Amino acid sequence: REIFPGITIHRNFERITDYEQGNPHFFVKEKGVYKKDNFTDEIAAALEIKDGIVVITGCSHPGIMNIIYTIQKRSKKKICGIVGGTHLVEADESRLKKTIAALKEINIEFIAVSHCTGDENLEIIKNAFGKKFIFNCTGNVIKIL
């Protein structure tokens, strides 16, 4: 849904990857019954720039790659950058490696991760992306052209 020219909001992310299955400890109560939360209400923004899309996430509970792949599929544009949470704090080594490989495969220009990535994983992602990595925190200004 376009909220402003060049800015769309997305939700109901497809579960495309086999390694991002969500946290089994989050539940929602529907009609008095608890069930696994699939985070269908989670949103992410897509900003159109000259070369493609910059994705802005909250916490990425559905999985950062599920979010990216869904937005890429819907927009039919290159994902140039990511700003926000990745929810990789609980990711095991296999999932983290697969996520890094997937991000490298789409050839992002920058990744500005923040909360819920985890301190150890921040270092691993920083080492994987070098100058493309930005540690994003409150008050940062990121110039997107």
Question: What is each stretch, according to the model?
Answer:
Residues E2-K50:
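Active-site-proximal loop/helix segment associated with metal-binding centers of metalloenzymes
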Residues R1-P5, G130-L145:
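Non-globular, low-confidence helical/coil segments that flank catalytic cores
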Residues V28, V33-Y34, I79-C80, F135-N136, ...:
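Short, intrinsically disordered/low-complexity patches at protein termini
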Residues E20, E90, N121, K143-I144:
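Short secondary-structure boundary/hinge segments and terminal tails
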Residues N38-A44, E48-V55, C59-T138:
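Cap/insert and terminal regions of metallo-dependent hydrolase folds
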